[in-house]
Curated annotation (Swiss-Prot):
Expressed in liver. This is Pyrethroid hydrolase Ces2e. Disulfide bonds join C105-C132, C289-C300. One of its GO terms (molecular function) is retinyl-palmitate esterase activity. Keywords: Disulfide bond, Endoplasmic reticulum, Hydrolase, Microsome, Pyrrolidone carboxylic acid, Signal. It comes from the Eukaryota. It comes from Rattus norvegicus. Coiled coil: none annotated.
Amino acid sequence: MAQTRAWKSIMPLESLPGWLNAVVWGLLLLFCQVQGQDSASPIRNTHTGQVRGSFVHVKDTKSGVHTFLGIPFAKPPIGPLRFAPPEPPEPWSGVRDGTSHPAMCLQNIDGLNLENLKIKMSRSPVSMSEDCLYLSIYTPAHTHKDSNLPVMVWIHGGGLCWGMASTYDGSMLAAIEDVVVVTIQYRLGILGFFSTGDEHARGNWGYLDQVAALRWVQQNIVHFGGNPDRVTIFGESAGGISVSSHVVSPMSQGLFHGAIMESGVALLPNLISNTSEVIYTMVANLSGCEPVDSEALMSCLREKSEEEMLAINNIVRTISGVVDGKFLPRHPLELLASVDFHPVPSIIGINSDEYGWIIPMLHPDSTMKEINRETMRAVLKNTAVQMMLPPECSDLLMEEYMGDTEDSKTLQIQFNEMMGDFIFVIPALQVAHFQRSHAPVYFYEFQHQSNFLKDIRPPHVKADHGDELPYVIGYLFWDMKFVFTEEEKLLSRKMIKYWANFARHGNPNSEGLPYWPALDHDEQYLQLDIQPVVGRALKARRLKFWTKTLPQKIQELKGSQDNHTEL
């Protein structure tokens, strides 16, 4: 209306010729209509066509967000594109609807053992399909092409076998911190990571999907108010492993400028492999393809229906990325040790009880219920073999973690701490130490015991695997609602501010927040709780045990075995 008043001050509308009067009012009405349409049903350009989003008011804020859901960043990976690198999406005519979530990638939802979690969850209404290479964008409603806001690209977790973009709502993060949030999907399980170990199927299809999504962001995010030169990738668990893998991959160079790894790095055991033989043999047997060679097997697998592929996927419960010579030229440990990675600022962190409750509940072991020292020795021998350690190392594990305790409950708790250290904590500290000499690393341990979980889990579990997620990103797990206390709301705002500051400047600190020092030789890190405080030398004794004591013992065992062989 200000524009109307300005026009009237120049020339009264009634003094204009009739036809011109009509044109002016028509333009004003059109202007108002376009403005309204842009707010409620925004339309943005991409390099393949236009997309229409929707306006969302974010609770507890004065801000609104425009959401654009299910934008294709690659062709559907079906037919000849099954087990193939993603290809650019086809252009479309007209305006594409971006107001509903895309189908999740093929996965074994029933394999999650959700009934063990004692949490009431409603099944996701999201459908499932191989045609799943889509991303969603959450951008502050005031943005325009020149807004140049920092971009945060979220990569979901789920062991490379489960997960979907629609579980994570970026609206809160976008509204509170004035950033553009992108959530992406990638192929999972067999369809995402199966490899023949040769040129017929190199594998890492899911990682290549993520690269394609990051390339799409570089091409298009400016139309959604984002700055392609200020992209931070962040993820949790397998999402953190993905982020860490992009840091060492030559294919991802230049596609991002900061990295956040929550409870997952590329050195996590069993999620990066030098070989694919075990899974190759299993899939070949399950498929009924009777392959003469890998080329024939891949040809046969591409002919299988979606239902047949899902049936195979449901039996092969775990799968890893592979050293394929392309996305991962060498094992991440070698790439990190030889400083063959992108020196970008990073936040790396873990939770205080990574193996505290949810992972053991998803993979229940009846032998742990009535454990004693004798049965624990047998469990540790078996565990050592699974860790690819000599069985003789089980005595060292017993001494380091169990001490002389006889109590069954304490033995269980200590076993879970050992597993959390082996799988999550030690790899995270190792990656942080490799990277800190070449770019700033900010390390954290999330320690808060969430009030809404205290009646569900054992009291000794403080911050379990995934517990930081509701505090960092608007998070909805299959319609499970989280109710924060007032203190927890403040903690969430602090964590969101740290993460967004990092996305904006490569440094999480700002006025009003407890200072978070970079990890240096003083080994300082941030303990994230209701009142964040700086800690020093996180798990230093355990780190020494896993990286010095155990390897030394293994070398001694190997030496004695070699001497015995010579005799």
